[in-house]
């Protein structure tokens, strides 16, 4: 069934630029974009429905390409402790930090995790997110990682959004493997990944390469295991120190390397040559009061596509707004509004391996788009909050109206 969407303007994001079409029209056929361009050039057609968008601006549906949205409990108490001067190390030594989230996640039922994640994700979806990634990594044993990944798959079946599932078993060392990191990595590679991938629960594999997590050599073992299973890889890298994890990610043609505050010029060059996307996470940078900025100019010099994500998680980025991350990326990292919009559309799609079907308004791609109550695209990075979407459309069907 063909529908005509008209009386609008469009920022198509073709090629990662605004690529603006004034006085635009868009034709959908089933779930796909059939035609888009200036309304004056609209070819004759027989449309089952004509939708007047009232002068709204259209963009591709937003994509949140890095979240940890499934977890048990929350850590608002630790937030208060940090503000009172208690260090993260002291909190962790008392059983807090990621260990507390692991305990709460292991104890929670699948239904409890599903309900809490849906509640967290609702604000993102209402604000224009039509695709997202969710990572495991708070289970850290086979049964609990399976539980998390099952919840992620169920969210994909129930939410009006495309949901990609990433196995992050190599997120932290579980307590039962204290002092035995190599043994845990072996368990991930020989037991967890084959089992979880065999059950169809995994779209990609991630790891955390950092002094407080896993070494580049240990991460490489995970990458090799993922490659043997035919799974793409991603990496948390260079958030707190420089271990050149982003270069390792590039060597394995990773979909993305994320955080990147401490990456070097050589790391950026390697990522550019490999086509690995840099996923910037300003929410975590802000909440941790970091001062080391990711090297944006180096990423630009080497042609590295920059995506932006919420990093929604209970410890370092309890962010329920992807649009707020656009403002933070402009204000804290000095990206342009155009770069940030590309970062939550086309480049975010690339970071999930979805660029053939998502991320820009082009013929043949899925008709996932948002009609915004704005006067120019830069407003999406300008306004802090507010109910800006007039309509959120997924697969040519309205899923939210403002």
Curated annotation (Swiss-Prot):
Report if keyword Lipoprotein is assigned. Answer: no
User: Which parts of the sequence bind Fe(3+)?
Assistant: 66, 68, 236, 311
Q: Which residues bind N-formimidoyl-L-glutamate?
A: 138, 313, 315
A GO term, aspect molecular function: imidazolonepropionase activity
One cellular component GO annotation, for this chain's record?
cytoplasm
UniProt subcellular location? Cytoplasm
Residues annotated as binding 4-imidazolone-5-propanoate are: 75, 138, 171, 239, 316
| Disulfide feature | none
Identify its protein family: Belongs to the metallo-dependent hydrolases superfamily. HutI family.
- Function of the molecule: Catalyzes the hydrolytic cleavage of the carbon-nitrogen bond in imidazolone-5-propanoate to yield N-formimidoyl-L-glutamate. It is the third step in the universal histidine degradation pathway.
In Swiss-Prot or TrEMBL terms, this protein is called Imidazolonepropionase
What phylogenetic lineage does the species belong to? Bacteria, Pseudomonadati, Pseudomonadota, Gammaproteobacteria, Pseudomonadales
């Amino acid at each position: 069934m063909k529908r005509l969407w008209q009386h609008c303007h469009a920022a198509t994001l073709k090629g990662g630029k605004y690529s603006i079409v004034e006085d635009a029209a868009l034709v959908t056929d089933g779930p796909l974009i059939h035609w888009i361009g200036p309304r004056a050039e609209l070819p004759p057609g027989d449309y089952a429905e004509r939708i007047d968008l009232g002068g709204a601006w259209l963009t591709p549906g937003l994509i949140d390409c890095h979240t940890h949205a499934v977890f048990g409990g929350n850590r608002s108490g630790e937030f208060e402790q940090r503000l009172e001067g208690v260090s993260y190390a002291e909190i962790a030594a008392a059983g807090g930090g990621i260990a507390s989230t692991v305990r709460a996640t292991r104890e929670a039922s699948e239904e409890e995790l599903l309900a809490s994640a849906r509640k967290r994700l609702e604000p993102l979806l209402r604000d224009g997110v039509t695709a997202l990634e969710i990572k495991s990594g708070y289970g850290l044993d086979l049964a609990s990682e399976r539980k998390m990944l099952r919840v992620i798959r169920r969210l994909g079946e129930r939410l009006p959004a495309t949901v990609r599932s990433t196995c992050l078993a190599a997120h932290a060392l579980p307590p039962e493997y204290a002092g035995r990191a190599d043994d845990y990595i072996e368990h991930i590679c020989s037991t967890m990944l084959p089992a979880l991938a065999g059950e169809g629960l995994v779209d990609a594999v991630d790891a955390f390469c950092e002094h407080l997590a896993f070494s580049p050599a240990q991460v490489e073992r995970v990458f090799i295991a993922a490659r043997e299973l035919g799974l793409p890889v991603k990496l948390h890298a260079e958030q707190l120190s420089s271990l050149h994890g982003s270069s390792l990610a590039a060597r394995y043609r990773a979909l993305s390397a994320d955080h990147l505050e401490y990456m070097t010029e050589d790391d950026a060059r390697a990522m550019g040559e490999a086509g690995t996307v840099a996923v910037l996470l300003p929410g975590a940078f802000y909440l941790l009061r970091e001062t080391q900025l990711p090297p944006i100019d180096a990423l630009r010099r080497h042609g590295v596509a920059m995506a932006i994500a919420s990093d929604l998680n209970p410890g370092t980025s309890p962010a329920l707004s992807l649009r707020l991350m656009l403002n933070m990326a402009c204000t804290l990292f000095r990206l342009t509004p155009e770069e940030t919009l590309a970062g939550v559309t086309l480049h975010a799609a690339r970071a999930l391996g979805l660029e053939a079907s998502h991320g820009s308004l082009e013929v043949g791609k899925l008709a996932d788009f948002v009609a915004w109550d704005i006067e120019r695209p830069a407003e999406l990075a300008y306004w802090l909050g507010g109910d800006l979407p007039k309509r959120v459309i997924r697969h040519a069907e309205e899923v939210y109206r403002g």
